[in-house]
């Protein structure tokens, strides 16, 4: 039923715990493909500069590159773990200042059947019922969203 599943990850242990759920849900081989997505967010003062004059001396590509290198390495490491367990995996690093928007747009554009996302990621604000990115994805998505709570990740 779910042939294309999107798993957004932000580098946190809580986000990565979703992978154990993906493995358990699809251990029977019913999953066609999982896509691991990392949204690289740039929220630097120069990112908000409006005029070309403001940023003409800043090489934005040189600033972005290390973030994408780190993102791609992170996803490649996770990909190799899943591939070694027999899963078909794709990875994607995308730039986006609003991760929930980037995730839902990507899911729609790529025809994903489901999104599996941790409720609390990098910020890990435990007092919130659902983290802001997961909340945004849940409310914007037109495909099923499986939320993974941090409590389900404890050994």
Predicted regions and their residues:
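Gly/Ser-rich helix-loop-strand patches that form or flank binding pockets
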Residues: 4, 13, 105-155
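Structural beta-alpha unit
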Residues: 77-115, 153-155
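Aromatic/pi-system hotspot detector in well-structured domains
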Residues: 2, 22, 31, 36, ...
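Short, well-ordered secondary-structure micro-motifs
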Residues: 18, 46-49, 101-104, 127-128
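Small/aliphatic-rich secondary-structure junction motif
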Residues: 1-58, 83-85
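General small-molecule cofactor/ligand-binding pocket signal
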Residues: 35-37, 90-94, 146
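Active-site loop/turn elements of alpha/beta-hydrolase fold enzymes
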Residues: 39-41, 96, 150
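A short acidic, glycine-rich active-site loop
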Residues: 56-73
């Amino acid at each position: 039923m779910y042939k294309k599943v999107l798993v957004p990850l932000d580098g946190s242990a809580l986000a990565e715990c979703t992978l154990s759920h993906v493995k358990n849900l699809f251990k029977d081989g019913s999953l066609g493909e999982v896509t691991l997505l990392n949204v690289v967010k740039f929220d630097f003062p120069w990112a908000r500069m409006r005029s070309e004059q403001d940023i003409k001396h800043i090489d934005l590509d040189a600033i972005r590159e290390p973030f994408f290198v780190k993102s791609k390495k992170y996803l490649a490491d996770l990909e190799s773990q899943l591939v070694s367990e027999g899963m078909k995996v794709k990875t994607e690093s995308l730039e986006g200042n609003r991760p929930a928007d980037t995730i839902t747009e990507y899911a729609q554009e790529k025809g994903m059947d489901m999104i599996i996302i941790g409720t609390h990621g990098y910020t890990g604000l435990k007092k919130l019922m659902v983290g802001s990115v997961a909340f945004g994805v849940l409310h914007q998505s037109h495909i099923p969203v499986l939320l993974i709570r941090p409590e389900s990740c404890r050994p």
